[in-house]
Swiss-Prot record:
Heme c binds at C18, C21, H22, M84. This is Cytochrome c. The keyword Mitochondrion applies. GO terms for molecular function: electron transfer activity; heme binding; metal ion binding. It is found in: Mitochondrion intermembrane space. It comes from Ustilago sphaerogena (Smut fungus). InterPro entries: Cyt_c-like_dom, Cyt_c-like_dom_sf, Cyt_c_1A/1B. Belongs to the cytochrome c family. Electron carrier protein. The oxidized form of the cytochrome c heme group can accept an electron from the heme group of the cytochrome c1 subunit of cytochrome reductase. Cytochrome c then transfers this electron to the cytochrome oxidase complex, the final protein carrier in the mitochondrial electron-transport chain. Keywords: Electron transport, Heme, Iron, Metal-binding, Methylation, Mitochondrion, Respiratory chain, Transport. It holds the Pfam family Cytochrom_C. Its main location: mitochondrion.
Length: 107
């Protein structure tokens, strides 16, 4: 389950594994993937102006630390039909670090 991780390590993971497709700040544009500002507490498939698959829209998943931690392990298993081309982060420590970073940076 989710435990507070190392946000600095999470930042490095974001930079190398996520930043090519996602932005974090309020008002920053969607890229290949949606802007992640306000991620926690938001329902999947609801970022304005982003073209989601039906699977993401229908999933109705509310993103919290625990649900996002699970999603990051294997996105295509968690939401079959997602177009996120990311194989997942297998190490729970890496996922905890990334979620800890995202929780701060997407507020």
């Amino acid at each position: 389950g989710f435990e507070d991780g190392d946000a600095k390590k999470g930042a490095r993971i974001f930079k190398t594994r996520c930043a090519q497709c996602h932005t974090l700040g309020a008002g920053e544009p969607n890229k290949v993937g949606p802007n992640l500002h306000g991620l926690f507490g938001r329902k999947s498939g609801t970022v304005e102006g982003f073209s989601y698959t039906d699977a993401n829209k229908k999933a109705g998943q509310v993103w919290e630390e625990e649900t996002f931690l699970e999603y990051l392990e294997n996105p295509k298993k968690y939401i079959p039909g997602t177009k996120m081309a990311f194989g997942g982060l297998k190490k729970e420590k890496d996922r905890n670090d990334l979620v800890t970073y995202l929780r701060e940076e997407t507020k």
